Amino acid sequence: MGDAIVVRDLLVDRGGRRVLDGISCTVPRGAVTGLLGPSGSGKTTFMRAVVGVQVVTGGTVTVLGQPAGSPALRHQVGYLTQAPSVYADLTVRENARYFAALHGRGRAEADQAISDVGLAGAAGQLVGTLSGGQRSRASLACALVGEPELVILDEPTVGQDPVLRADLWARFHAMAAAGTTLLVSSHVMDEAARCDRLLLIREGRLIADDSPAAIRAAAGVDDLDEAFLRLIRAGEPGPAGPAEATRSRTGGMS
């Protein structure tokens, strides 16, 4: 089967600044991989490169065996951006059914996607009348309705209450158990423990790539917040460079 995503020496420059600096990593199939890091660390740029909509300076990104952005991937990759990507003048149901039709799916699949994100009670509402968190979930339903092999989710739980966050993560893991690969970004470190594997980015560099348990063990602490702080401090630029030094300590694949 191989890995769902293979990134090698990825470089991205934007506005005269290096946004991603030589990132190499893999994302295994059928698992939830978390992309963690502070705001502005390069998470969204990394996801855009995986989807194939980001101009890259160097390196390669392979997705499901194809170069990122290949036409063959259009119906295999679902992408949820931070900004709502649905039509405000249509209802939640109309949006979901429209995107379902684009993927050759029917009304039943659209209605199921709405239910899966907890919006069944708001299916008849215009998206423009929804709260920010509800709009995000409407976008999520549209990203999932095509049953893609790979789902890229950029901050999917921002603005959601704790109960709904838990429900969404349960849904993500159910999808992974059924064979879907998920790459989920967050700047909220308490969501890291919900992932099967973690990629930690800071200032455009990969400083950790391993399971939550292995990262805690490498840092010598039980708390992931503290583990990340220690890895960040240990990964300050030095002779070996931050990414290389930390990947060596955690034993992560890159």
PLM features: what roles do these ranges have?
Residues 151-155:
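Catalytic Walker B motif of ABC-type/P-loop ATPase nucleotide-binding domains
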